[in-house]
A protein has these predicted regions:
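Hydrophobic ligand-binding cavity/cleft-lining segments
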Residues: 1-57
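Exposed alpha-helical structural elements
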Residues: 11, 21, 59-63, 134, ...
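Short, solvent-exposed secondary-structure boundary motifs
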Residues: 23-31, 67-71, 95-100
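Glycine-rich portal/gate segments that line the openings of hydrophobic small-molecule binding cavities
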Residues: 36-91
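Beta-strand/loop substructures that line and gate deep hydrophobic ligand-binding cavities in soluble
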Residues: 49-50, 74, 79, 86-140
Length: 162
């Protein structure tokens, strides 16, 4: 998965290091509840972010509710390196409380002709016999939509529209 920004790598990375950005991004996420659990800035320009988002069970598709009762509480961690040579890398993990689901991924933010490009690769694992693959595909498609929404929000944030 990849998404492009009109702004340069430095501006995008600067947003990722801003607590106000994360609070606003979470508020814009569409989750029923969203919180910034922690943000830690390193002296090298790195940033570690932990978030929790809750989706109420009434909003979940049948494919999900037949295997998970109640609300989905999604924890996500992003650990971005500081900028080096107009580039930053991240390790991203996600899990759902009480569900046999895990997401692990790697992201690269680097310069492009248009400004910056974020490339994201993720592995989704659902440990449910027989239907795990269907759920993995569903979650993968949701990740694509989420990446697009986050790119649009980040673009608006950098432009001062949020």
């Amino acid at each position: 998965m990849a998404t492009d920004y009109d702004a340069g790598v430095g501006k995008v990375h600067s947003a990722f290091c801003d607590e106000r950005y994360w609070v606003a991004r979470l508020a814009d996420s569409g989750a029923d509840e969203a919180r910034l659990d922690s943000i830690t800035l390193g002296p090298d320009g790195s940033v570690d972010v932990v978030t929790t988002q809750v989706l109420r069970s009434t909003r979940l598709p049948a494919l999900v509710t037949q295997f998970h009762r109640g609300d989905l509480e999604i924890q996500r961690e992003e650990s971005w390196t500081g900028l080096a040579d107009d580039r930053a890398d991240a390790v991203i993990t996600g899990s759902i409380s009480g569900a046999p689901v895990s997401v692990t991924g790697h992201a690269e933010l680097e310069a492009s002709d248009a400004g910056a490009r974020l490339t994201f690769q993720a592995d989704v694992t659902v440990r449910v016999p027989l239907v795990g693959g269907k759920l993995e595909n569903f979650i993968g498609n949701q990740l694509l939509e989420l990446l697009g929404a986050e790119q649009r929000f980040t673009t608006r944030w950098i432009a001062g529209e949020c």
